[in-house]
Amino acid sequence: MSASHSSASRSQTIHRVEVRPGPGCVDVRGSSLLKRVVADGGAGARAINHAQVYFLSGDLNQVDLDFISRQLLADPVTQVAFAGASAVPNPGCTIEIHPLAGVTDPAAESVELAVEKLIGKVVRVQTGERWDFHGASVSEGLGVSAKYLANTVVQAVHAAPYMPTQFPAGAARVVEVKEIPLLKLNDDELEKLSRQAHLFLDLQEMRAIQAYYRGLSREPREIELETLAQTWSEHCVHKTLKSRVSYREKSLVMGSPSLLARAGKISGHSLGEVGEMVVDNLLKHTVAAATHSLMDATKPGSIDWCLSVFVDNAGVIAFDDTHALCMKVETHNHPSAIEPYGGAATGIGGCIRDVMGTGLAAKPIACTDVFCVAPPDVTVPKGCLPPARVLRQVVAGVRDYGNRMGIPTVNGGVWFDPRYVGNPLVYCGVVGLLPRELVRGVVRSGDRIIVLGGKTGRDGIHGATFSSTELTDSHADEFGHAVQIGNPVTQKKTLDAILAARDAGNKPLFHAITDCGAGGFSSAVGEMAKDIGAVVNLERAPLKYQGLTPTEVWISEAQERMVLSVAVANIAALQKLCDDHGVTLCDLGEFGTPNKELILLWNDLEMGRLSMDFLDGGLPNPVREAVWDGDWHARYAPVTAPSQKRSGGMLETLCALLAHANIGSKAWIIRQYDHEVQGTSVIKPLVGKFGAPGDAAVLQPLAHSTRGVSIANGLATGLAADPYIMTLVP
């Protein structure tokens, strides 16, 4: 059985336009790069110039091209536009950096829309950057590019002005129902399949899948295996935190704390056969148990302001009698280790979408971020990016996404430690506000599966399963496709349309909403349909380009997509709102099936069929071993710092302290963030006459109320290497 994609390839006329600073205007990008190169001891270039490059393909005459160049692409006050490629400096070289095929190009998307609005013509656009190194050789220019500018995971580097002959276009391809031989595999072969197919499921999980399909007397289809891998990934299900843990202790010294006494006295903590303590579901019986205990109305002093915990995309607490606050925080470490800008941008973008997908859509009102990276002078292992570049780019990623969406970034922190050299900590957070009566949504059988926002591409495939594996020096090559590049403008328009649909009439136009993050449609639709099933028509998904397989469409983690459960009667009204806001709407199928199944179709060809009971409840819960080693604790848990004693007076000592990376000012980061947008910040990140860092930021989210929200954070990795010991430090 097969079907075909349509072809989208044709000849094109491509125009190149360069935009650079005008006469008498400072080249900020070029001079900034030159300062960094000189400060790091680089040599070669006497001057560096920067230009933005645009490629436009379409039915454009010279008048059109001149108008677009001068009125849209270039600022007539500070910039000049040049058609074609300007001369390479002599002596010197030119290095150009362009997005790889299939990588999201947000600036190009905005230009395409603007051209259509301005002159009524549809064009295709690609962008790039040109760097002219005066007095430098090509090898020196490429060296600067590799160190400061380009990431070959998502970008192509050219040692001369680049001119494409045509834009990439998807090719026609046959769609087949691909089966994966699994039923007869032994354990070694199951583990090999899991790794080679990038499923990253362990042996017990692969055995569970094998048993399920043996019960069906058929081999699994590719799209079914991928669905299980996404749904059962560490990122999506937090299986390590939810696992059963067998805990024992050894080599305890006098005075060391012991947890074994808890066995049998606390819910979920039982005594094992050989004296160990078994915790059944670590998350449920520790972190969640503490919260639910505080909420227990039968206990004195219980709290009543936790409105929704551990069930939605973000936890929800009461703000006042009519409104609630939610907050979502998330690490985006693995992607940021490979592509820091995209990793951080999609980290904060994902938290924004989680807040949008909480209850019946919360409005994001603030962003936070914490970055932990290695010191700039640390030795960088093979396959890792320089820490200074990682920090600059993760800051830029959060800055660009939050600022362009109009959400203030009001709080954060930075910490330097050599242990972050291989995998930085990129910890993003978003606070949202929503009416209390909209804290919960419920998917209804018969509702349409509606997708709003961005189009689907190959970016982000296997991002969820990638989070379940260990980073090595080959991951930049092997998992470049797992990195997503977001478009905050698309997400801003989507947010506006969703809030308009939420506030339309007496009740929202949708019954439930979630974001399309890790695992793409597979996780979003699978999560919403877990109790009732769904039928999905994958061929309906709007694509960035043709040629994607049904499996790629299903698991793509392309950004800025939200999934809604919408009654048929509300589709027309929702479509009207989306048209008003310039947002794409797609009807992907229907929630609810007679046998509670997930059915995946492509032009009526069944690509996959899974029981929701197995997809949602079939994940094995293994016993993980945990050992408290007193000897290890004595040797490694205490954190020591080398002596910083030095001769000299108090002023010299003070200057040395202020020069330390963990003490010095972070204003260069804070000042890049817009903390005034939305007009709610009462106490800013920097306070006082001299702009010192404040203890917390305070927001006034409702104009008619003086009730405020205080946001702060703490980081204390210097207390101990063992997190439990850290809680005991007075």
Feature-to-residue mapping (PLM):
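Short glycine-/aliphatic-rich beta-strand segments at the starts of folded cytosolic domains
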Residues: R10-P23, H50-F55, N90-A101, E129-W131, ...
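A common structural junction motif
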Residues: V37-A43, S69-Q79, V115-K121, G143-A156, ...
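Short amphipathic alpha-helix segments
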Residues: G24-G42, D66-S69, V103-I119, G526-A541
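Helix N-cap motif at beta-to-alpha junctions
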Residues: G58-V63, G135-L142, S565-A572
